Amino acid sequence: MAIKRLINEHDMELWNNSKTFEDVIGFINTLALSVRGRENNDYTQPISDNVQRVSNLLSKVTEIIGKHEVIKDANTSRFGKIEFRDFYDDISEHSNELISKIFEGIEKPDTGKLDDICTYFINSWGDRSRIDYGSGHELNFICFLYCLTESKVFDLENDSSNIVLMLFIKYLGIMRSLELKYWLEPAGSHGVWGLDDYHFLPFLFGAFQLSTHKHLKPKSIHNPEVVEMFQDRYLYFGCIAFINKVKTTASLRWHSPMLDDISGVKRWSKVAEGMVKMYKAEVLQKLPIMQHFYFGYFLKCPEGVSEPSARAQDHHEDDSCCTDGSHGHSTWADCCGIAVPSAIAASQMANKDVRLFPFD
């Protein structure tokens, strides 16, 4: 069974120098390089049966979302909608059945391996207790794809670009639906000093897509007409369009200064290179995120890491994950703050013209 193991800085040092760390970032690099110069719909043909099966699995997730409408506090709360927990429970209950269908016609992994795959899949959709989502959950989806690759579902030589362009983009679309429908709170958002309240990898993959483009430049994100024209063709511009849609009170320079700074880089290839370095530093090397990372059969825990604690494995605890002092922080950690309503919630409440307080 996949379990959490990273609880202190010593563990993080072992993790940062481990083969598993290199396997994860190497997998992301392989996927990123495979989409250089490709638009979102530029799939590699023929599309393999296994890629199509995983795409069908994601379509089932969309169907499950449709079964759980927001009813309670639909118009009166800026925080995450509790119906998200019903969706999450539905996914958890049916994950084994759904994922088993991927292996029709090929060797199915044993129960332990399948349980690991299900763990990454379930945790790809956010946190049930806190009703939030962040880059750590996004990483779980990458681990899910990695496990399928290690299980011979994917052949990276032929499937890598389609894993990004068909599967990751479809996953991103589903997550946007969840964020909008259930007003998921941003898990560990860096506020204006982050790329996005929820996601990192669309910017990384998107920068690689654009790294060979002869005309579009990083500064093009400030041109509304260019963003509108290319939002469906490149991940990076799609992310900018989404941010502009939900953060309407100021310009990109004000609400997303990190993206504004990056837009000053001359070439997309340099942006892509910087995104990989930033992903290592801001996701894979950050304890508040990686304390929730699962190790198991496919992604081995480095030797010498702390033994697992029972509390760290609890998927559904209602209180803060930090009340036992099981890990330390050098900064205000992603997991220790109060609930922060999403920009999506603020935007939709404003559109409904709901005013809960006279100073709201």
Swiss-Prot record:
Keyword entries, A-Z: Cytoplasm, Isomerase, Rotamase
**Coiled coil spans:** none
Give the subcellular location.
Cytoplasm
First-level EC class: isomerase
Q: What is its EC number?
A: 5.2.1.8
Explain the purpose of this protein.
PPIases accelerate the folding of proteins. It catalyzes the cis-trans isomerization of proline imidic peptide bonds in oligopeptides. Acts as a regulatory subunit for PP2A-like phosphatases modulating their activity or substrate specificity, probably by inducing a conformational change in the catalytic subunit, a direct target of the PPIase. Can reactivate inactive phosphatase PP2A-phosphatase methylesterase complexes (PP2Ai) in presence of ATP and Mg(2+) by dissociating the inactive form from the complex.
Q: Sorted alphabetically, which PANTHER family does this protein's record hold? A: SERINE/THREONINE-PROTEIN PHOSPHATASE 2A REGULATORY SUBUNIT B, SERINE_THREONINE-PROTEIN PHOSPHATASE 2A ACTIVATOR 2
* Descriptive protein name: Serine/threonine-protein phosphatase 2A activator 2
Which species is listed as the source?
Kluyveromyces lactis (strain ATCC 8585 / CBS 2359 / DSM 70799 / NBRC 1267 / NRRL Y-1140 / WM37) (Yeast)
